[in-house]
Amino acid sequence: MAKEDCIEMEGTVLDTLPNTMFRVELENGHVVTAHISGKMRKNYIRILTGDKVTCEMTPYDLSKGRIIYRAR
């Protein structure tokens, strides 16, 4: 799947789950389960509850996503 097909949304981390998974509430009110992207994992970017993040989702499954950016 091409990168252009992904949907990017802003959200807030609600909860930390096992295996570097997070529960994220998006701007539109939906709650998704998201994991950290590989570059964030490689650079040891820490994500805590309450952080503002950018989440990338595929149009095929809107309940799962990938965290690609953490706002400062």
Curated annotation (Swiss-Prot):
UniProt keywords, alphabetically: Cytoplasm, Initiation factor, Protein biosynthesis, RNA-binding, rRNA-binding
PROSITE patterns per the UniProt record, alphabetical: S1_IF1_TYPE
Chief localization: cytoplasm
Keyword Protein biosynthesis assigned: yes
Gene3D superfamilies for this protein: Nucleic acid-binding proteins (2.40.50.140)
Matching InterPro entries: NA-bd_OB-fold, RNA-binding_domain_S1_IF1, S1_domain, TIF_IF1
Domain of life of the source: Bacteria
Function: One of the essential components for the initiation of protein synthesis. Stabilizes the binding of IF-2 and IF-3 on the 30S subunit to which N-formylmethionyl-tRNA(fMet) subsequently binds. Helps modulate mRNA selection, yielding the 30S pre-initiation complex (PIC). Upon addition of the 50S ribosomal subunit IF-1, IF-2 and IF-3 are released leaving the mature 70S translation initiation complex.
Family: Belongs to the IF-1 family.
Protein name: Translation initiation factor IF-1
Gene responsible for this protein: infA
